[in-house]
């Protein structure tokens, strides 16, 4: 066979192989179309079966592919349904970490907002961290002077719980230097307070749209909770204060449905002071543990019924939970009166557990450092000092700050009771540290059926930043 014949032979064989390969592909495609196109194929080919087990819990999506089943659980919530939130608070033995955002550590090199007053609130499908920005980023010149509480640059924004308050994932909620937010099962409602001290306005948003307003009625820094409001069967409740921070002020409870205010009532509390309430649903009512910035080192308690009737007093426990405060041994509790004669204060929280109470407080008696939560037997109804449990969340070598409450709804947790949760703000920068800015990160804890060991989930950022050295 001469060279030309060899070339022709090899070429013919190659062409034959190519044609054979093409025919195999064509046959494969035809067989696949015929098999997948059949109806009633006994479930052995690609088929999706959707079974709704409970309209408020999940859809079970089963995909069967050549006798191999893949089960994917898809969270499902009927957005036309209100959350109930009339269940009791779960009885818990300790609190386990839920999330930590590490915002300041990340912000040394990332695009993270300068914030204060972070808080958490949950819908039937997710929890979000809300926070008040200063309209500036960490490690940037506009962070200078952000120790100031109220400015036209402050806004309420939110991210999924656990995310840092960063530029790329944050969602705008309202223009605000004081705020609250909650979900009724259908949409988010936010209340953002902004404007001048003497004529501040609270703008109610529902589903992201302004729906109502509350104007300052006392002309002295209208303000609200700085934590989650509370929705029960479609109605949402929150508490507002207008008046002095260091003497008698005025207090109101508001009730809204789909972002429209449908009721309000003044709280009569002569001699007592209410600010920055931390509220949660329990047994069909709203229970709030607040801040007395006037005299008391015990915390005001406000229990709100759906008809806006209320009971107001103080947390009975014989242990103080505000800061600054005196020695535990020298404190005598009261269910009706402020005790301790210490001005100023810090936002805090408590949870009723039957007649017991879980109460959070800074470890330091004089500064916002460290954080612990105590369970006091009969502390909701009596001046008891009996601690049955204590858990450290931030050690006393590290800064803390505000703290507040929220609950996991049964639609989210799958339990038949409301899981009690709390967050602790960890303030960094001015006035305690040598920076030009003030900001914070947070740790979030939720109740569990087990005791949890003490540890310190502190902020951990190394200061000062580059901007502070310029």
Curated annotation (Swiss-Prot):
Organism: Influenza A virus (strain A/Duck/Hokkaido/8/1980 H3N8)
A Pfam family hit: Neur
Annotated protein name in UniProt: Neuraminidase
Function: Catalyzes the removal of terminal sialic acid residues from viral and cellular glycoconjugates. Cleaves off the terminal sialic acids on the glycosylated HA during virus budding to facilitate virus release. Additionally helps virus spread through the circulation by further removing sialic acids from the cell surface. These cleavages prevent self-aggregation and ensure the efficient spread of the progeny virus from cell to cell. Otherwise, infection would be limited to one round of replication.
Residue ranges, annotated region (Involved in apical transport and lipid raft association): 11-32
EC numbers, comma separated: 3.2.1.18
Localization per Swiss-Prot or TrEMBL: Virion membrane; Host apical cell membrane
Record region (Hypervariable stalk region): 32-86
Segments on the Virion surface face: 36-470
Segments traversing the membrane: 15-35
General remark: The influenza A genome consist of 8 RNA segments. Genetic variation of hemagglutinin and/or neuraminidase genes results in the emergence of new influenza strains. The mechanism of variation can be the result of point mutations or the result of genetic reassortment between segments of two different strains.
Topological type in the membrane: Single-pass type II membrane protein
Record remark: domains: Intact N-terminus is essential for virion morphogenesis. Possesses two apical sorting signals, one in the ectodomain, which is likely to be a glycan, and the other in the transmembrane domain. The transmembrane domain also plays a role in lipid raft association.
Keywords from the named record: Calcium, Disulfide bond, Glycoprotein, Glycosidase, Host cell membrane, Host membrane, Hydrolase, Membrane, Metal-binding, Signal-anchor, Transmembrane, Transmembrane helix, Virion
Disulfide bonds listed in the record: 90-417, 122-127, 182-229, 231-236, 277-290, 279-288, 316-335, 421-446
Enzyme class at the top of the EC tree: hydrolase
Keyword Protein transport applies: no
GO MF annotation: an example: metal ion binding
């Amino acid at each position: 066979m001469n060279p030309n014949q060899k070339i022709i032979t090899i070429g013919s064989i190659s062409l034959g192989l190519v044609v054979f390969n093409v025919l195999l592909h064509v046959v494969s495609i035809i067989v696949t179309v015929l098999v997948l196109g059949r109806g009633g194929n006994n479930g052995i080919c690609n088929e999706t079966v959707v079974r709704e087990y409970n309209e408020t819990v999940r859809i079970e999506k089963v995909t069967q592919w050549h006798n191999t089943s893949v089960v994917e659980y898809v969270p499902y919530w009927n957005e036309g349904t209100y959350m109930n939130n009339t269940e009791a608070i779960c009885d818990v033995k300790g609190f386990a970490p839920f999330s930590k955002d590490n915002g300041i550590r990340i912000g040394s090199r990332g695009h993270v907002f300068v914030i204060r007053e972070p808080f958490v609130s949950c819908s039937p499908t997710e929890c979000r961290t809300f926070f008040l920005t200063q309209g500036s980023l960490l490690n940037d010149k506009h962070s200078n002077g952000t120790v100031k509480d109220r400015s036209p640059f402050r806004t309420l924004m939110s991210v999924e719980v656990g995310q840092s308050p960063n530029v790329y994932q944050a969602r705008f909620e309202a223009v605000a230097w004081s705020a609250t937010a909650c979900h009724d099962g259908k949409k988010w409602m936010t209340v953002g307070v902004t404007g001048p001290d003497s004529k501040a306005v609270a703008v109610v948003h529902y589903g992201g749209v302004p729906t109502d307003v509350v104007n300052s009625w006392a002309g002295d820094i209208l303000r609200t909770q700085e934590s989650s409001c509370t929705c029960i069967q479609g109605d949402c409740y929150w508490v507002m204060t207008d008046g002095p921070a260091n003497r008698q002020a005025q207090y109101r409870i508001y009730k809204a449905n789909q972002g429209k205010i449908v009721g309000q009532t003044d709280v009569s509390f002569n001699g007592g002071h209410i600010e920055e309430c931390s509220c949660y649903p329990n047994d069909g009512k709203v229970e709030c543990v607040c801040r007395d910035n006037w005299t008391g080192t015990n915390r005001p308690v406000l229990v709100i019924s759906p008809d806006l009737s209320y009971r107001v007093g103080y947390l009975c426990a014989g242990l103080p939970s505000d800061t600054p405060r005196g020695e535990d041994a020298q404190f005598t509790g009261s269910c009706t009166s402020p005790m301790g004669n210490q001005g100023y204060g810090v936002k805090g929280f408590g949870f009723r557990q039957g007649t017991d109470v879980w109460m959070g407080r800074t470890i330091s008696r004089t500064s916002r450092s460290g954080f612990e939560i105590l369970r006091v037997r009969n502390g909701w109804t009596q001046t008891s000092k009996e601690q049955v449990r204590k858990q450290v969340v931030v050690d006393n070598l590290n800064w803390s700050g505000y703290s507040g409450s929220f609950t996991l709804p049964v639609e989210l947790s799958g339990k038949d009771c409301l899981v009690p949760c709390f967050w602790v703000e960890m303030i960094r920068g001015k006035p305690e540290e040598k920076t030009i800015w003030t900001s914070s990160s947070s740790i979030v804890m939720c109740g569990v059926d087990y005791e949890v060991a003490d540890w310190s989930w502190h902020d951990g950022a190394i200061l000062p930043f580059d901007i502070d050295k310029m």
